[in-house]
Regions:
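Residues immediately within or flanking Cys/His clusters that coordinate Zn2+
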Residues: 23-26, 40
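Flexible extramembrane loops and terminal tails that flank transmembrane helices
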Residues: 1-24
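Glycine-rich active-site loops that engage anionic ligands at enzyme catalytic sites
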Residues: 64-103
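Well-ordered alpha/beta subsegment
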Residues: 93, 98-137
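Cys/His-coordinated zinc-binding microdomains
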Residues: 30-33, 47
Length: 137
């Protein structure tokens, strides 16, 4: 499936730079000891901006929900229909979630609760790598 190419800004550039190195990083607040995603200028829990830093994660999680898209309005995704969209809870902080198309997983075989690990796919328009997830158990 074609991947949309993100255009990183100053706030999410560290995230996408790490993706290009095939590392998964998200923000962590050293003040309240919590992870957060997507990136924000300050901690979404305590409001502190001086204590927010980027930390590398294990790249493991679990599928907590999913849908199958049969009719997308996004023209670049139409050739890949139907496709999965899964919600992934990160092992380090299950309250923090990411979305994935689960490349290589048939639309009728997405097990809720299954373990997943991050992989990185290259977008065709810019060459930017983006995180995706694959089922491992």
């Amino acid at each position: 499936m074609a991947k949309q190419s993100p255009i990183p800004d100053a706030l999410d550039k560290p995230f996408y730079d790490a993706c290009n190195e095939e590392r998964l990083v998200i923000q962590y607040c050293a003040n309240c000891l919590r992870y957060q995603f997507p990136p924000r200028p300050e901690c979404t829990r305590c409001g502190n901006n001086a204590s927010v830093e980027w930390q590398q994660l294990s790249g493991r999680g679990r599928i907590i929900s999913r849908v199958v898209v049969h009719d997308t309005p996004t023209s670049s995704l139409i050739p890949g229909q139907p496709f999965n969209v899964a919600v992934i809870a990160l092992d380090e902080e299950p309250e923090v979630t990411m979305l994935s198309h689960l490349p290589g997983t048939p639309v009728d075989q997405v097990p809720i609760g299954a373990a997943v690990e991050v992989i990185f796919e290259t977008t065709s328009a810019t060459g930017q790598k983006v995180p995706e997830w694959r089922v491992v158990g």
